[in-house]
Amino acid sequence: ASGTILSYIMTKAMNRNLLKVIFTPPENTAEDAEKSVRAIHQGTARDAAFLMENAAKVIIVPGYGMAAAGAQHELANMAKILKIKYQVDVKFAIHPVAGRMPGHMNVLLAEADVNPDDVFELKDINQEFQTADVAYVIGANDTTNPLAKTKTDSPIYQMPILEVEQAKKVLFVKRSLAPGYAGIDNPLFYADNTIMLLGDAKDVTKQIVADLE
């Protein structure tokens, strides 16, 4: 039921028909062939720590992957260290349909004692990605997918996204390169300014925290 409610909210935001979104299978034959020959830039926790400790502004983008891994406390700790030890401007960017229910990310961040003044909704934060040194994307797949702006046959076409690709560097934490809820590939994985941090979101973030400390 929660998935259907989420789909309804997404389709309202996209001004699209719910049944069409649910029952239209993603087209991926040519896409899969192209994906198989594309390379990613894979990094380590130390790479991520180095980039963030030397940044002026970091925007953290949590998604369902953070919730599934239970990584909110590690994420809050990472943000705290960056702010206090390295004087980095750290903000959290929340997509309205991130997670499995409205407000899912806000609840988890509040549970981890993240300052609500550091948490911003899509409409209030999107313009800041272009001045961010690092976007730390933790399990937020469809809500950051640039295909929402260009691929007319995509189930997420016209859904507003968080413009993370505008950051100087994108650190994308994900267990694998598998598609998200919408079932489509994310070209961000293969972008020149993206470093993939493959693994469990909680473990990866914990390793970064250890390096930052």
Question: Residue spans of the language-model regions?
Answer:
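Membrane-interfacial segments at transmembrane helix termini in multi-pass membrane proteins
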Residues: 1-55
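Structured cytosolic domains appended to multi-pass membrane proteins
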Residues: 36-213
